[in-house]
């Protein structure tokens, strides 16, 4: 019997209680962030991405942010990802890190395709971002511009929030 896919295993795991989620009881450290990045890179992006500098901390207005640079970081990536350190559940964390990795792909990989066509690099929620939607869904991930908190607590379903 084949080993279960680690992304799908996380995404299909039972959700914690809503009370637990509202306390943002799922906390991530460097080991969890690195593991999540590696499995998403392996399964969704076919190891095309280089591990960027990833920082976790208090974020008030966003869950995650990918910031592009025209100068490579020591990791070899031209991006830096900032993530919250507190999450409703592991599934929410996986969706956000995968979302930010889609932006990293736009900046680190797709920038060369755009340059060949005389275009500037772009990090947006456009066609080059949503081309990953089908690949995400194969692993139980949902690719959207943003997930709404209120609707999440109403439905507990990423496709509805």
Predicted feature residues:
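Active-site recognition of the HExxH zinc-binding catalytic motif
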Residues: 95-108
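Metalloprotease/metallohydrolase-associated module, dominated by Zn2+-dependent proteases
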Residues: 5, 15-92, 108-161
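Intrinsically disordered, low-complexity N-terminal tails
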Residues: 1-12
